[in-house]
């Protein structure tokens, strides 16, 4: 799975004694738009000196991983106070790139030259291994993508929101837009990466935008996607009702469904059933997170196969509203199934 | 003493005492005058005390005595510490009276002097001028209109009075619109068609009011701009025009934002779409119109909203009216017909409505389905596009691989070596690039530092400039204040009565002070002379004593041997004794002379006290009292 060519580029941002943050180096290349976004994310441009050692996110289907370090002891980097190492890649695997960038950071701190860093990068690219000066070496094989996907804890999500988790489940199933707000980036990253696990059968992590600023370029990129999970640290996002169908206020443990999504998100007996199932599965102390995810996935597949069975087999296994109506479901369930069919691309057009 | 007396008399006159011109000193004061002066002073110092006393001496002796007693009491109440009684007033002597007057004059309040010390502003001056004018006008008696002279007509007729009624004026040169920027047409209008200001208002009487109003509005606008520019504009480091345009853009943006948030569509409110479209129109018109207008002119926003509310409504109203008019049935039809027709119409309409709502529902369901399917399709399209791109990539790679497949082992080796060599080359290139990059980055940082240094320097200078501005303003204000004060004082000085006495007094006082200084110098000189003399005397006495002792001893020694020497010793002793006596006598004479002088002085002071005349007066008064007493006793007896 973990093929090395998933890595796209390597970049270096430095903050110097003039409090000036600057892109100083990159290999092979990063386009200007992405560079600007990276500058915003690396938290060096902000005046408040809160340092986020590791952040990640997605922009235009490119994942970025930024490790920021403060230069403390006297090194070769005389005029530099902080620097960030930016790795962009095609795949979602925070742990892998965190480890890799830590190695790179140490190298750069020691030598003060990006050439050594680049040697490491090329080694990983060609051989899948990078020799570190201390602590052994970085082996790309150690980091399986499955592990990365399972790293988020659904149990924590359910323990925080309880029965309300069903709203998140429904929203994700119907490919709705979910916006999560928390003032701390770390909490945001932790929480949002767990949400796609609710729809494990799709294994689509491209809906995840864990760290978005309220800036035009990023919002444009977000609006292109049909459904997403986006994390914001800016409390103003609450007033941007054009950005979300479901708003999660993480510090207050509040979930709000926006007015224009209420109809599509109306819930019925089926939801109650699934909700109870999720809560029970998550509360079971013996079950691991992976097992919980699996349980939910099984349940989802059950629903989907139900839905498939309704489809007209003669007609390329596609559904119509009439087919659904023959099932005589309660209106809320019918509505849900109809939208679900659209989300799973089962509708006949 | 003459000077003191004149000052005293001047002050007493000011306090209200009527003193004859020929009275020049306190010595000339009669008892009546003294009583009057004291009472007047007391009235000024403490009205509660002074008002209970009469300022003229009563004819009856006992009444006079009582008045004297109460006056003495009042003086003590006010704070006079010296010896005082009825005799002070009735049988006056000069020094006592003088000290009493000096005390009283000192206690007189000096409000007039204090008031003139405080600086008065322009408004105070104006108010004073108004007060003076009103006083002057009030002093002129009112005359019936026919009897008025032209002088009176100005102030007493009601003819020229108008209410303050201002009208907007149009002026070619004003602060708000600089003449250069205006289009040619406007300039031509100014040149050829604009009426002079005197002809612009509808009534000629409101010309001054309008001009004043116009002037004040421009002045206040200019001041506002000045203060804003000094406080904020200067710090923004922009030229005034740039600052203005930036402020304009900012305001416009804010207003637009406010309107936009207010216009956010709410699904549960009916007619929201209408108001939003209206607001959108407004926004558009606002954006379009205000680009040409001047944001500083107040009321742009209001005129636009006005236009908006008043132009839209009438059109709609007209349309509605027309529709209603056509629907009205002709009144000539009978009522029943009308009813039946109405019912039929009603049912038909209801049917239509039902049909329409059913249709609506159907179409709504269709729309919903379609939107959902559109969503699905777009979603699918996106995923397809992504997978397509991925597949294309993989196809490319696979094709290359297939090309290399026939000679797999060789090619693999070749590829590996290629990868290795190219990675080495890349690293090499990177290190070469590093050689160029590092100096460039360093240069960038150095320049940036320089730049920030310069910036801080410039901001420092800017703050300095601001300080200077403040200082200039302060100084200007101060100068203005001082100038006005100077003017005020000048006018006051001109209006002051040319009373030379004051300057004369000051000159005299200065002279007196000079004299006193001179006298003091002389006294110190005499004192030092005296001291020198004393010293000399002491020295001589000591010398004498020593000489005598030595001579005495010498002569005494020889006296035992020689008879003639004994004789001379006796003479010596006698001489010494006589001389001592002589000195003693001289000293005694000195003391006696001094005593004589003291006594002479005492006699003079006693003479000054007019004892003889006072005694005669006392005797007379005593006789008068006795007469009064006997008269009273006779009356009692008769009664």
Swiss-Prot record, chain A:
Its main location: other. InterPro entries: FAM45, Tripartite_DENN. It is found in: Late endosome. Residues 296-349 form the dDENN domain. Residues 160-294 form the cDENN domain. Pfam families: SPA. Residues 1-135 form the uDENN domain. One of its GO terms (cellular component) is late endosome. GO terms for molecular function: guanyl-nucleotide exchange factor activity; small GTPase binding. Guanine nucleotide exchange factor (GEF) which may be involved in the regulation of late endocytic pathway homeostasis, including endosomal positioning, maturation and secretion. Belongs to the DENND10 family. PANTHER family: DENN DOMAIN-CONTAINING PROTEIN 10-RELATED (PTHR28544:SF1), PROTEIN FAM45A-RELATED (PTHR28544). This is DENN domain-containing protein 10. It comes from Danio rerio. The gene is dennd10.
Swiss-Prot record, chain B:
It is found in: Endosome; Cytoplasm, Cytoskeleton, Microtubule organizing center, Centrosome. Residues 331-370, 459-541, 591-638 form a coiled coil. It comes from the Eukaryota. Keywords: Coiled coil, Cytoplasm, Cytoskeleton, Endosome, Protein transport, Transport, Ubl conjugation pathway. May be involved in regulation of NF-kappa-B signaling. May be involved in copper-dependent atp7a trafficking between the trans-Golgi network and vesicles in the cell periphery. Disulfide bonds: none annotated. One of its GO terms (molecular function) is cullin family protein binding. PANTHER family: COILED-COIL DOMAIN-CONTAINING PROTEIN 22, JM1 PROTEIN. This is Coiled-coil domain-containing protein 22. Belongs to the CCDC22 family. The keyword Transport applies. Its main location: other. GO terms for biological process: positive regulation of ubiquitin-dependent protein catabolic process; protein transport. One of its GO terms (cellular component) is centrosome. InterPro entries: CCDC22, CCDC22_CC, CCDC22_N.
């Amino acid at each position: 799975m973990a093929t090395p060519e998933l890595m796209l580029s390597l970049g270096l941002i430095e903050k110097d004694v003039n409090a000036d943050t600057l892109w100083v180096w990159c290999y092979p290349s990063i386009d200007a738009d992405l560079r600007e976004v990276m500058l915003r994310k690396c938290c060096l441009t902000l005046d408040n000196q809160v340092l986020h050692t590791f952040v990640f996110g997605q922009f235009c289907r490119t994942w970025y991983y930024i490790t920021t370090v403060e230069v403390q002891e006297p090194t070769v980097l005389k005029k530099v106070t902080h620097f960030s190492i930016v790795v962009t890649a095609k795949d979602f695997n925070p742990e892998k790139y965190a480890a890799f960038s830590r190695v790179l950071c140490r190298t750069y701190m020691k030598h003060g030259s990006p050439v050594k860093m680049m040697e490491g990068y090329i080694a990983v690219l060609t051989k899948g291994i990078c020799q570190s000066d201390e602590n052994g070496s970085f082996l790309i094989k150690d980091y399986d993508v499955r592990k990365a996907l399972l790293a988020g804890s659904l149990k924590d999500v359910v323990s925080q929101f309880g029965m309300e988790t069903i709203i998140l489940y429904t929203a994700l199933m119907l490919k709705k837009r979910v916006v999560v707000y928390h003032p701390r980036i770390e909490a945001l990253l932790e929480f949002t990466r767990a949400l796609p696990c609710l729809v494990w059968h799709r294994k689509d992590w491209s809906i995840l935008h864990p760290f978005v600023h309220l800036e035009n370029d990023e919002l444009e990129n977000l609006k292109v996607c049909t459904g997403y999970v986006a994390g914001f640290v800016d409390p103003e996002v609450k007033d941007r009702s054009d950005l979300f169908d479901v708003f999660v206020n993480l510090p207050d443990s509040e979930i709000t469904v926006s007015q224009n999504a209420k109809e599509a998100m109306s819930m019925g007996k089926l939801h109650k059933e699934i909700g109870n199932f999720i809560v029970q599965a998550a509360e079971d102390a013996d079950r691991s997170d992976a097992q919980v995810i699996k349980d939910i996935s099984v349940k989802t597949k059950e629903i989907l196969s139900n839905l498939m069975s309704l489809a007209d087999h003669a007609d390329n296994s596609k559904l119509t509203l009439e087919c659904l109506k023959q099932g005589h479901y309660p209106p809320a369930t019918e509505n849900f199934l109809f939208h679900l069919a659209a989300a799973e691309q089962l509708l006949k057009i | 003493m003459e000077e003191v007396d004149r000052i005293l008399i001047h002050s007493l006159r000011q306090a209200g005492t009527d003193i004859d011109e020929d009275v020049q000193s306190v010595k000339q004061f009669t008892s009546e005058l003294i009583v009057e002066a004291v009472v007047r002073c007391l009235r000024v110092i403490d009205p509660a005390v002074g008002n209970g006393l009469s300022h003229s001496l009563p004819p009856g002796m006992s009444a006079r005595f009582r008045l004297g007693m109460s006056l003495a009491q009042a003086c003590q109440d006010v704070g006079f510490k010296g010896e005082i009684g009825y005799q002070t007033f009735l049988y006056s002597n000069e020094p006592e009276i003088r000290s009493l007057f000096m005390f009283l004059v000192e206690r007189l309040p000096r409000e007039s002097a204090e008031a003139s010390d405080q600086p008065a502003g322009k408004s105070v001056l104006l108010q004073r001028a108004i007060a003076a004018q009103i006083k002057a006008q009030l002093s002129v008696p009112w005359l019936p209109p026919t009897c008025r002279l032209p002088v009176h007509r100005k102030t007493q007729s009601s003819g020229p009075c108008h209410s303050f009624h201002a009208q907007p004026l149009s002026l070619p040169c004003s602060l708000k619109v600089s003449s250069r920027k205006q289009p040619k047409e406007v300039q031509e209008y100014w040149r050829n068609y604009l009426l002079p200001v005197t002809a612009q208002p509808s009534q000629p009487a409101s010309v001054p009011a309008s001009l004043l109003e116009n002037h004040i509005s421009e002045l206040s606008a200019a001041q506002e701009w000045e203060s804003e520019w000094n406080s904020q504009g200067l710090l923004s480091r922009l030229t005034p025009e740039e600052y203005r345009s930036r402020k304009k853009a900012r305001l416009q943006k804010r207003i637009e934002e406010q309107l936009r948030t207010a216009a956010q569509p709410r699904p549960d409110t009916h007619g929201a779409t209408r108001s939003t479209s209206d607001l959108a129109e407004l926004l558009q018109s606002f954006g379009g119109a205000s680009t040409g207008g001047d944001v500083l002119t107040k009321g742009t926003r209001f005129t636009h909203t006005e236009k908006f509310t008043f132009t839209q409504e009438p059109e709609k109203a007209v349309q509605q009216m027309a529709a209603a008019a056509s629907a009205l049935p002709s009144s000539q039809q009978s009522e029943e017909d009308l009813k039946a027709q109405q019912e039929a119409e009603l049912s038909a309409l209801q049917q239509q409505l039902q049909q329409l709502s059913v249709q609506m529902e159907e179409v709504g369901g269709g729309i919903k389905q379609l939107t959902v399917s559109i969503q699905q399709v777009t979603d699918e399209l996106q995923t397809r596009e992504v997978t397509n791109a991925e597949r294309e990539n993989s196809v490319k790679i696979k094709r290359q691989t297939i090309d290399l497949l026939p000679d797999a082992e060789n090619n693999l080796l070749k590829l590996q070596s290629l990868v290795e060599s190219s990675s080495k080359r890349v690293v090499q290139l990177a290190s070469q690039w590093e050689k160029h990059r590092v100096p460039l980055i360093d240069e960038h940082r150095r320049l940036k530092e320089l730049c920030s240094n310069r910036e801080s320097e410039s901001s420092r200078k800017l703050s300095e400039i601001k300080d200077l501005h403040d200082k200039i303003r302060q100084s200007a204000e101060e100068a203005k204040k001082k100038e006005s004060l100077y003017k005020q004082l000048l006018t006051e000085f001109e209006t002051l009565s040319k009373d030379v006495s004051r300057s004369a007094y000051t000159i005299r006082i200065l002279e007196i002070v000079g004299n006193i200084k001179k006298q003091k110098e002389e006294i110190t000189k005499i004192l030092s002379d005296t001291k020198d003399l004393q010293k000399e005397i002491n020295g001589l006495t000591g010398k004498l004593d020593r000489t005598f002792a030595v001579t005495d001893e010498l002569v005494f020694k020889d006296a035992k041997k020689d008879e003639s020497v004994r004789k001379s010793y006796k003479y010596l002793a006698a001489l010494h004794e006589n001389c001592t006596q002589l000195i003693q006598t001289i000293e005694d004479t000195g003391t006696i002379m001094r005593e004589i002088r003291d006594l002479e002085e005492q006699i003079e002071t006693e003479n000054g006290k007019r004892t003889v005349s006072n005694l005669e007066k006392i005797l007379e008064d005593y006789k008068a009292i006795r007469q009064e007493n006997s008269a009273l006793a006779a009356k009692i007896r008769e009664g």
